[in-house]
């Protein structure tokens, strides 16, 4: 890796660390901007993934028990693509192992929605990994002939992709997808190994950022997926502001907000607000 690239990565880490915990989502957007500027990615998607099934049940599941808990895209995707993703990967279980959760993995159209890449990603769970669409980690010639590739790549003009997966724990992973779109004319410029190495260095060294991001969105075993309101309340709590002030800013009754705070504490397995805040300091 070139010395100039290393210095850019160091500066990015400093910039990410400068964001307070309450502005972790802004740090995510900043990181996505960086990938777009320095690696010419047309879109960046962040996924929080959670292992929901025990070992025995996971053996019979096409995703080996892993489920998408949260998904954020840097650019607004086509409505048809958003509906396609939601039709299969929506987090309707909200942390509960409902019948719909189990049926999802056994639906007749599972192979259409769960492509070769996704299956390989979950098979390798537990290690930091980086892959390019055409670097040989999957049989690309076979992959591009699948219905999954047509629906999820060709119809959405995704010409190339990098997968970067950070294992925060044995049951939680932070996943970044960097996409390049098919240009209007000419051939697409595929990601190089050097570009993938730069992206990997950025994310492999940002351990604290991954953990803050995952916690903010409730991507932890036993924690239900947080609603948008709960996420905003949590962001307010992380600023250190009084609950009354947070309630006013969110248009909530203080007593109602107090109930939300208690619920958040319970979901994160703590009993007080200071203990909840300590999670972001690595003290719990």
Model-derived features: positions:
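Intrinsically disordered, low-complexity basic tails/linkers immediately adjacent to helix-turn-helix/homeobox/MYB/SANT
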Residues: 277-284
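Short helix-capping/turn signature of helix-turn-helix
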Residues: 237-241, 282
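Short alpha-helical "packing" element that flanks the helix-turn-helix/winged-helix DNA-binding module
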Residues: 230-237, 276
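Recognition helix of helix-turn-helix DNA-binding domains
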Residues: 240-275
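A cross-family signal for key residues in well-ordered alpha-helices
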Residues: 200, 235, 248, 278
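Amphipathic alpha-helical "output/dimerization" segments
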Residues: 187-208
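Regulatory hinge/linker segments at domain boundaries
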Residues: 211-232
